[in-house]
Every structure is written in C-alpha cells, then in structure tokens.
Amino acid sequence: MQQSHIRNFSIIAHIDHGKSTLSDRLIQHCGGLTDREMAEQVLDSMDLEKERGITIKAQSVTLNYEARDGETYQLNFIDTPGHVDFTYEVSRSLAACEGALLVVDAGQGVEAQTLANCYTAIEMDMEVVPVLNKIDLPQAEPDRVAEEIEDIVGIDALDAVRCSAKTGIGIEDVLEVIVNKIPPPEGDREAPLKALIIDSWFDNYQGVVSLVRIVEGQLNKKDKIQIMSNGQTHQVDKIGVFTPKPLDTGILRAGEVGFIIAGIKDIQGAPVGDTITLAREPADAMLPGFKKVKPQVYAGIFPISSDDYEDFRDALAKLSLNDASLFYEPESSAALGFGFRIGFLGMLHMEIIQERLEREYDLGLITTAPTVIYEVETTKGETLTVDSPAKLPPVNDIAEIREPMVEANILVPQEYLGNVITLCVEKRGMQTNMTYHGKQVAVTYELPMAEVVLDFFDRLKSTSRGFASLDYNFKRFQTSDMVRVDILINGERVDALAVITHRENSQGRGRELVEKLRELIPRQMFDIAIQAAIGNHVVARSTVKQLRKNVIAKCYGGDVSRKKKLLQKQKEGKKRMKQVGNVELPQDAFLAVLKVGK
C-alpha cells in the first residue's frame, strides 16, 4: 500500500460515549468480519472489559476502505483505553497515529478525561476530528455540544460529523472524514528500521505478541531485531496485521501498524513505548517518550487461607505476563500471614487486578489499605522510599516526610462548583487555576495523592450528582507532616491495620478506625481495649465490653460475704483469661480500614 493511502487514527472518548460501538460499526462497514462473526465490542477481548464497559489494553485493526473518490485506503485504527489510570497506554497509542477522532456523546457533552487525552493529542501535533455520537437519542443536543467542544477544547466543531454508532447513521461520513482530514504517515521506507511498541501481550503458544507501528524503514519475517532499551536481540517468527483476526503478511513498511511475534519469553522484554530496530543496522536514537511505568498505589494482598499462597503466586506471575505495570514482592504480616505487596497504576487498576485474581484464578483474598509512595529523609541524611506503613522508620529517626502531590483537573457544571471546592479543601487541596467555559467550569487543584487515591473519585461524583469529571497526573514530592497511626488491640500492635495519614486528620482518623473496629470485633469473656496511637501517644480508645455470667444467681438470700467471694473469684478468672486470651479479628475488620473517611 502506498504511504499516501494509509491513515492511522485512534478514537478519543470518555467512558460510555460509544467508542467501542463506533469501532464495531467501522469494522462492519469495511467488511473486516462477516455478520456472523460480528460480536458486540469486538476489540474488548477480556470479559472484564466487556462487563465494566471499559477498554484496558490497546488493540488494533487494519481495514481496507473504498472511498467515494474510488480509491482504496488502508485505515489502521488503534483502540485506546479511556480511563485515567491508563494514561500512559493512551499516550503510546496516540504516538502511533497521525490523527484522532474526538467522539463526544451528543447528550452529555465534553468530560475531563476526554479533554486530557485530547490535549495530549494536540501537543503531539495530531489532527483532531470531532464526531458527535448518539444523535438518535431523544436527549441529544448536537448544536449545544458542538459549541461546547469549541469553547472547551478550542477546535472547530461546526461541521463536526454527526452519527449514531448504534443505529449506523452517518458511519460512512465518519470514514470519509478520516480519509480527508487525517494526514497520511511520513517516514522513509529506506532508512534504518524504527518501530514503536504500542502494546504487548502474552500468548500461551507464541510468547509475547507486540503491536507495533513502523515509523521508518521496513520489517520482514526472519529479520533479527533488537529492543533498544535493553539491547536484547530476537528473530521475527511471524509478522502481520489484525483485520480483527490475525493475518500474516510477512512484511510491514513505514507508516503501517501490525503485530510481530519473535519468541520473546516475558513481557518485560518488550516494554510498551520502546523502540525496535534491526540488529544488523540499528537506528541511532530511540523514539521519544519512552518511560518506565511506575506504580502509584501499593496495597498488601493476602490469601485468606494460607494453603492458597502457591496458587496466588502463580496467578500473579501469569497476570504480570500480560501487565507490565504490575509490580509485586513477597510480604509477611503477623496478622495475615504470607502475601504480596503489589503496586498499581491507580484504584481502578487495583480493583481490576483483584477481581481478575478472584474470578479467573478462584482465590479468596484480603486487601490492606492502599498507600502511595512517600519519600522519607532520615536524621542520618538517607532518603528512603516507603510504600507501606510497616516500612516507616521510628518517629525519632525521621527528619522529614515528603508526600506525592498530583495536579487534578476537574470539569464541573457551575451549579456544583461550590460542593467540589468544599470537597477539595477538605482533602487539603490548593486551587491553582479556574476558567469558565459556557456552563462548565474547569478547576485545577494541587492535591495530595493519598487523598485522591482513596475515595476522591466516588465523593466527587456524589457531590456533583455524577456530572463532574476528573483527570490527574503526578506533579512532585512535597514536605508534609505525615504520621503513622497504629492500632493496638489489648496492647498489641496489629501491623495490617496501620495507616499513614496527615497529622491534622490523624486523631479523627484514629477515632473513626477505633469505633469501626469496636462494632466489628465480637465480644469475648474479657474486656478488649482497642487503641489508636501515634508513636507512644494514644489518641483514641474504645472498649469492647466483656460478656459475663451471673455467678450469684444461685444464691438465695443468705450472707453478703458469700456473694462477694463468688464475684471476687470471677474477677480473678477474667484477669487470668485476659492475660492468656487471644482476640480473633474477623475478616471485616481489615476492610474497615478501607472504608474510613467515606
């Protein structure tokens, strides 16, 4: 295919604005699959993706489209995830394209994540083409939404294509716009090979399959390739394109998007965003924008029964074959036994991994409260990174703690602005910017990541009745007065219940935890003292009252000293019990930590 007839594009859309349905229609229109094979949401291949209606991994499809001018064009569509946790995957998918369709729901209008991805695309000098979807709905207001796109995003949307992916109206117009508005790829087919890895996943039979965009040069079957970030070399066994089904072509040239299989054994060997080149004539520099993906949120995950530990470890190893951003290391806890400390990109990522472990590998798991990474400077001048409360050094050894700050961009209708500002202030946020776009307001806050990670998203949705949308990215580490709140039960620390929090909130947080635990721990034959402490200073306490038998019920009248003797005996028994008795913590107690502050 000549380069002038290739179009590489992706679709930018908020969750539920109809991206996957639109891509299904495009595939159907170009005859990529027969009607019998046409399942809903062809590109979302994980069950979980279909169920939650979100796209997690990037996928691609190559379609041949006969345009109205009689020419045949090759359209390479790269599907991108839309959720805020997967922004790096989005930026890699966008880097492989020359243009993007900005799909906006004609009923709902522009949302913050769409906006964030759209700005990423504009920064990369991509052509952004607006498309109004769902115009068949009774509540659709295409004219208002077109104005909103112009106000907020700043691109011309008066002649935006209007379509309905569900009913198939306007699909051909969308294809024509792709051909006419999006520029063809540039790139010298004679230059040394440079290919961008858009995504990699693991196939049980063929090893790692990488989705690549050839930027310069060409790649043939049996070529020896080199991965530029780690210098490993492999031989290409298979090369081709997805029409959603894999089709071997034996060659890919500059400007094209396809897959390669080169017998790579683990996904770390082909990291997303890396550059592939030929071993015999390597390119002189990597493609820009590659970065190692860093986990933002850590949580300890433990199997409920310790017999499952081996299965749990194998399950994690299998999951990490397909997910390069998953980081894990063994951890043991006095309360929960052996498990793993796992790093995630964000809360959605954490929920998805946990759900996949429970669903696909049939494991029962306990999760401890998620924490972010803190930088701790000790009095000896060393800098440590701490990802769990247990690793925090003793109070006397800490010179300062720095916590990660994020820049959060929030888009909200004017009438809910007050609620959102109140919420951000409560979460220790600092407002840095505020602009009005028609009825919407865009506010920018600097917030501590620890506050955003826990329940900020849920609370933002509830205070704004679901209208506010959020996008955030890591900004820097900032010195902050953080403390560890320990929970003591009958004077013994329970490591799995400790949390790191800001000193201002520590008393409230401690009190809430203690109250929550008091409701959950069953009563025993002796008093159970639950305390929250910072260092040696107890900030909150509560007692689970003992159950006691009425020992003097059998006495009729008679002398009072007889009753006293029985009560005294009971008291001594209780005292002895308290010294030897252990408190069994129920499963819910560990979940209580996650719910505090909601």
Curated annotation (Swiss-Prot):
Keywords: Cell inner membrane, Cell membrane, GTP-binding, Hydrolase, Membrane, Nucleotide-binding, Protein biosynthesis. Residues 4-186 form the tr-type G domain. It is found in: Cell inner membrane. Its EC number is 3.6.5.n1. It catalyses: GTP + H2O = GDP + phosphate + H(+). It is a peripheral membrane protein. It is an enzyme of class 3 (hydrolase). Its main location: membrane. Belongs to the TRAFAC class translation factor GTPase superfamily. Classic translation factor GTPase family. LepA subfamily. This is Elongation factor 4. It comes from Alteromonas mediterranea (strain DSM 17117 / CIP 110805 / LMG 28347 / Deep ecotype). The gene is lepA.
